[in-house]
Amino acid sequence: MLSNLLNEKTVRIADGKKLDWKTSIKEASKPLLEDGTILNGYVSSMIDVVEKEGPYINIGPVIALAHAQPNGFVNRVGMALLKTKDSIALTSKDHMINIWFVLAAVDSNSHLESIKELTKLLTDPNNVEKLLSANSVCDLLNVIKNVDLNFAVKRKEDKK
């Protein structure tokens, strides 16, 4: 479940006034650094990829999913979320971001279920609006938990 990865330790809110896109990725990564999920080299890898490839991590209006190839800097699958009250330009003003996800993968497959659940969360415009209007970590977690519940119910129905 998404809430196993996105919880009170890995979800944060910042005003964003003093952040640029690199600092936003670093701030979003902090919980994963603090709990040993990733090492600093992974944060550098995520920034390097954006510098080389452009804003490909901009996966939808106001949403970025920072990630890099699985490498020796990831100890286990992890995800973190930073919501900024102010929009931050990801490489240019054409890519304004408020919702910064960080995904850490140890291989090419172990994170796929998490991606599927994240897709369920972010493809519903109502969920995105709720994330944007959230004023607390608790508000953000409630949106995520609600999606988890709906996802679990759907899986049970699909098995019938």
List the model feature ranges, each with a label.
Residues M1-K160:
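Cytosolic covalent-transfer regions centered on His/Cys nucleophiles
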